[in-house]
Amino acid sequence: MAQRIPQEVIEEVRHRTNIVDIIGQYVQLKKSGKNYMGLCPFHEERSPSFSVAEDKQIFHCFGCGKGGTVFNFLQEIEGISFPESVKRVADLEHLSVDFDWSEPREVADTPENQQRRSLLQLHSKAAELYHHILVNTKIGEPALNYLLERGLTQELIETFQIGFAPQKRDFLSQVFKNEQLDETLFEPSGLFVQRDNGTFLDRFYQRIMFPINDPQGNVIAFSGRLLKTADFPGDEMPKYLNSPETTLFNKRETLFNFDRARKEIRKENTVLLFEGFMDVIAAWQSGVKSGVASMGTSLTNEQIRRLERVAKEVVICYDGDNAGVQATNRAIQLLQENSHFDLSIVSIPEKLDPDEYVRKYGAEAFQNLANHGRETVFSFKMNYHRLTRNMNNEKEQLDYVNELLRELTNVQSPLERDRYLNQIAQEFQLSVHSLEEQFNQLKQEQRSVQRQERQQFYQDEMMPPPMEEPVFEENHVQNKLPLTQVQKAERSLLFRLMNEQGVRQTIQQLPDFSFAHDEYQELYFLLESYATLHQSFDIADFINFLQDNQTKQLAIEIAYQNLSEESSEREVADLLHVIALSSIAEAIEQKKIQQQEAKRVGNQQLEAELTMEIIQLARQLKAQRTFT
């Protein structure tokens, strides 16, 4: 099997792709002369400096300097490897990149791709039919009137391709049969339910239909809202019914409206997170077009990872009732534990949901609330912790204050902490000094617990009992120097990368990460190259994939480590922290060497600049160690 995509294949894919069409899915482009201009997605700017040359099929930002081909753009914006970017472009152009081939082939050549494309066509036809029924037929009039009464416009219904599934249970199946569509696709599509006699009934009936799209805008599933009428009360039916999971649709990875909102999210570096589809649509109609919603379930790590590729800030805008407040608190906890997002909250007043708020107060009021009514996580927590306490009781007041001080240990900004300490002191007639003492005590306890956990971690994970070294070749040196703490951390992290896809995804989202030692960095590059060629990671196969004997031996030693079967998020964070400290220390040493050379040749300006850089790095190193 070839180990990389042949150059002629790369060129063929590029020649059959228009870079403007691809980049236009991420950046709003406007024609300017012979090129297209837009706001750069890689740095903040107010005037466009990002240029796409259609004739040359390249892009360049005159502000930050980034540029390249369509593959380089996707590598940068989606955080993927070069082979993955080639495959990504090929998918968008309906070509399949196979590492064994020498010419591009149409997606239909493989059974899996053929079925996927056929299922996408089936969903597209269903969406078109449902939409036609809603806007053009008498059967759809009650549903259309309901939506118009809810404040939706015809334009909005078109934008979201909202439709209606009639009450007749075999409506869609009969239409598809009349069109002689492949009935073997009915069951895996999720659009139908098969009866005992082998015939098919429509899964969705008497429902307003919301198409659910993948990031490229293809319909992959539906969510149907029950439409109750006098002759169809539907009392025992669920209000919302979603498609089951299929080869197209994984609800843990899917976000409603992500395909439409992505450009705006990229532009603002911010995403608004809603609970329901109607909330997203109402926000869109109000001019807030960076909203998405999870699929009727709590937010998932897979959805968080998708959002991390396009945004730096998440604004949680859930319902204002008690259930919505509880869901907001859970989302905060999940996001704080599994991401590095800046978080803020929009609390909807009067226990309304966003859709109700828009209908009651109008689009302008909601837009103002969404843009200017955001509160910090701590401000939300202040209100949240009141819900379960009797604030007229002195003991519960003190418990409340202690709970807030614990929450305050998660606030990094000194200004924000100072403001809230003064606010708490004023409300409960306490001295700021006493609150600071209590806060510092809690902070010290927190650091002590973290330090103990890290020490236990290194005892349990970083220093496993000695094992017999596998013999690989005759000149293998048995008496090696003891590994340093950094080397142990690097080996443990590589072990996790070999065994856990989630850890690989985490590292891929850290563009500035690198191993401290070249041999481990090289192995990591080879590991990533292997992963792009294989759907699953097999240690033995990976060893065979490696060409250099020393690298193979290193991989074997790492694979033989006696570590737990599954890592924790804390373990991975600790490993990254140890490696990062080493990288800073190494950078300081390199700067010192450069400084001595500048001094030797009499370059005083460079010497002074390097001195300042060394000071900054030393402060950074000290801060990191203090945090530890």
Curated annotation (Swiss-Prot):
Cofactor(s) named in the record: Zn(2+); Mg(2+)
Keywords per UniProt: DNA replication, DNA-binding, DNA-directed RNA polymerase, Magnesium, Metal-binding, Nucleotidyltransferase, Primosome, Transcription, Transferase, Zinc, Zinc-finger
Domain of life: Bacteria
InterPro entries assigned to the protein according to its UniProt record, in alphabetical order: DNA_helicase_N/primase_C, DNA_primase_core_N_sf, DNA_primase_DnaB-bd, DNA_primase_DnaG, DNA_primase_Znf_CHC2, DnaG_bac, DNAG_N, DnaG_primase
EC class (word): transferase
Positions of CHC2-type zinc fingers: 40-64
UniProt EC number: 2.7.7.101
Residues bound to Mg(2+) 1: E275, D319
One Pfam family matching this protein: Zn_ribbon_DnaG
Cofactor info, note text: Binds 1 zinc ion per monomer.
Domain Toprim as annotated: residue spans: 269-351
One Gene Ontology cellular component annotation held by this UniProt entry: DNA-directed RNA polymerase complex
Amino-acid positions noted as binding Mg(2+) 2 in the UniProt annotation, renumbered to this chain: D319, D321
Reaction catalyzed: ssDNA + n NTP = ssDNA/pppN(pN)n-1 hybrid + (n-1) diphosphate
GO MF term set: DNA binding; DNA-directed RNA polymerase activity; zinc ion binding
Entry remark concerning the domains of this protein: Contains an N-terminal zinc-binding domain, a central core domain that contains the primase activity, and a C-terminal DnaB-binding domain.
Stored PANTHER family: DNA PRIMASE
Job description of the protein: RNA polymerase that catalyzes the synthesis of short RNA molecules used as primers for DNA polymerase during DNA replication.
Name of this protein: DNA primase
